[in-house]
């Protein structure tokens, strides 16, 4: 069975891992980095992903960041003269990670386990699955990020019984999960979180502070300047990282804008104390989900054996301090917060292929599921933190006499009224025979699969007529749309490969021209004029081809020059050998022959 890669599709950074033997390994990207920025840019019709896209973000307005925060919504982003869904942009990141894995493994990769925040709803999970499909990946499993982290942490500890709390604060989302580990079973007891809280929010607090301070000093609002804002974002992210290790950092942005008197520079010092003050409300927002998860799991802090920190934002000292305070535990530092999720996803891939034995993953649904009933009430069928996959049925009836149809309004959330929860979908069960209210028996069944994706069935027990839907949110893509996007993605991949081949061909041709010129200089006056002219002509032909766009012509001219250059190189080599031989003979001749009766010796002059 071919390898199933593990992918952590993050808000700010992503990572890809693979199981080698029994060990999960992070695959470095072509730049040698173990994580890849979740950044996509468009330039001259070319799609740029990762480190290269992030590097040019300041000067390129066609750069898209933090697309994960839009997953599961109908919001689109405009770039490159067209509109893209969040799934399409995410697919470009996934394609990049897929190519990295293929280059490392030396084989095609078609299957993946992709992680999502535990608190992702059905629409966001479905969007992630669609993104994988567009990227040409069969998504074998969607795994919650804290669960994947626990899997990576606990794989070599399957003989121990432990309860662990995973605190996962990433670039755009926050989750807390509590798991029980024992005998190879990873059982999620509870999960809580916030899909709108992460490192990006901490960056924004610094940006807002810099904008306000600069306006106070110079009367200019940098918030209105797109290019300045991108520089501020980069500086804020760097300052935040610096303050995890030092207590003060200098922010220096020369020529940030211009005033009436000329260019203006931004120079500010940010202390950790000020940063803590600016972000106090964000850190505090992580407290309640920790308590909620413990309460839902029916545990107290003394029951927790280990606390794992996951996500780059858990390096913030104030966050670490809050976790210490809430759990009365020193967080476990044995896992890399940026890499552990992808490693866990790769382990789950190994469980699916059978390479990892005796490991069972029991995940939960993060939010309650149910339907709207009379009076706009939300009636739950499946409570949050129910182990998945699961199925639950309940019988309802009509609200009016002779009601011919019932509307099934499917919801996800925790609020008592339907209007306050997230709508997953609506459908109708029709042709109900005329009967007084309360008589027809309508059975509603919820199914949640191992990926946390929901399907709902309504059945009239009297007529046995039923209607089923797999939930598709407003942002959900039809199969036709996904197929079209897959074809576009494949075309982009082919175009990228072709563009790379063209660049490589041009680079090789340039190098060949340079090498030929060097060889001709070395051979000056040592070979026949006709041979030199032949090489000169071929070289000029190639230089001329390089000025054009015909890659096949460049290849043909390169091959012709390469053959001539090789012959010249052979001649140069032969001449060098011949010269060496002559030099050796000349030395022997100078020393002259020695007579058999002649001896070498030292002598002194006697006085």
UniProtKB/Swiss-Prot annotation:
InterPro entries: ATPase_NBD, Chaperone_DnaK, Heat_shock_70_CS, HSP70_C_sf, HSP70_peptide-bd_sf, Hsp_70_fam
Cysteines paired by S-S bonds: none
UniProt entry keywords in alphabetical sequence: ATP-binding, Chaperone, Nucleotide-binding, Phosphoprotein, Stress response
One matching Pfam family: HSP70
Region spans: Disordered: 578-607
Superkingdom, taxonomy of origin: Bacteria
Residues recorded as bearing Phosphothreonine in the entry: 173
UniProt name for this protein: Chaperone protein DnaK
Organism whose genome encodes this protein: Lactococcus lactis subsp. cremoris (strain SK11)
Gene this protein is translated from: dnaK
